[in-house]
Amino acid sequence: MAVGLGPLSTLHPVPGFELGIASAGIKRPGRKDVVVMRCAEGSSVAGVFTLNAFCAAPVTLAKQRFLGEVRYLLTNTGNANAGTGEAGLAAAAQTCAKLAELAGVAETSVLPYSTGVIGEPLPVAKIEAALPAALADLAEDRWAEAAAGIMTTDTLPKGASRQFVHDGVTVTVTGISKGAGMIKPNMATMLGYIATDAKVAQGVLQDLLRDAANKSFNRITIDGDTSTNDCCMLIATGRAALPEVTQASGALFAALKQAVLEVSMELAQAIVRDGEGATKFVTVQVNGGATHQECLDVGYAVAHSPLIKTALFASDPNWGRILAAVGRAGVANLDVSKIDVFLGDVCIASRGGRAASYTEEQGAAVMAQAEIGIRIELGRGTCSETIWTTDLSHEYVKINAEYRT
């Protein structure tokens, strides 16, 4: 059950960006599993992609094409088209070619995305058969339906939207994401699509997305597995009656950057809240590092520890497991006598051992909550990083043991 994640809030339409949904029956008959997105002519597009060496065929194709003119994004669920070799690349290209033919655009202006089971051939004929219905469904107000259409093991659709006013003009930023397992992005299975009607030069848009992703999608982890199919795209349609953003400065850029970051963080945290089998939403904050990287190393050592994650599931304040994870994070010359560890606001460990004021009852009270904070003070410098993760439950094992059945 998703932790603190309710129904979708209002997802504002983005002028110049349309979405259409259809059923191809890839994994289950009747399921809406194909989503087509249409970008207005002249849109600029940015993308960040998985660093997994076995990246999926659609990722390879999208990376090759997104810097050119982009008119359509084609997403299917139920099949990842990963681990499929040259045949997978040909299949992805074939579905793009069919959509391009139906829409009357260049084949290279169609970007493919897939999510689902790895290693199975893409059912090209089923996807092609669903394309006319998806095109007929295109509309600017279909964000919620598209959010549901890209789900796999997700239990709830994920979306976020922000608006701000600049010089009397309303600018919209809206996005959707999917993912619940195989989540440890490095830009899981994670897909994210964000659109704005601001007009933004491609280079500025790319930097804006990369910065937002590094503070959101690249700071979440459920199981430590980086997917073959991770992608996050940011589309700027330019339909808002404002000057083009051509550099990373000025009031319009600052407002847009904040809106994109807020949408990205909400989408990323929604993925964690809906983590497979998750019963806890956990914020791991590491402060006082000499570098940002060592803060991340410590944070991920804690967030990825099966012993800590199972203790979280059991609501067991086993603070020794946290100390052990910090100690094996690989931080050079770590002085444990300077480290303090907190569960919520409760200091559980200080100067290398149990805090003098700590009681088991205090720790148990924090661990019983659905949302838990673990704060680690390294006492080495001024750098900080935050990571969001989950516990590890019986249900996670069950979901993944039965995934292909």
From Swiss-Prot:
Catalyzes two activities which are involved in the cyclic version of arginine biosynthesis: the synthesis of N-acetylglutamate from glutamate and acetyl-CoA as the acetyl donor, and of ornithine by transacetylation between N(2)-acetylornithine and glutamate. Keywords: Acyltransferase, Amino-acid biosynthesis, Arginine biosynthesis, Autocatalytic cleavage, Cytoplasm, Multifunctional enzyme, Transferase. GO terms for biological process: L-arginine biosynthetic process; ornithine biosynthetic process. The keyword Cytoplasm applies. It comes from the Bacteria. The active site is at residue 189. It is found in: Cytoplasm. The record marks 115-116 as: Involved in the stabilization of negative charge on the oxyanion by the formation of the oxyanion hole. It catalyses: N(2)-acetyl-L-ornithine + L-glutamate = N-acetyl-L-glutamate + L-ornithine; L-glutamate + acetyl-CoA = N-acetyl-L-glutamate + CoA + H(+). This is Arginine biosynthesis bifunctional protein ArgJ. It holds the Pfam family ArgJ. Heterotetramer of two alpha and two beta chains. Substrate binds at residues 152, 178, 189, 276, 400, 405.
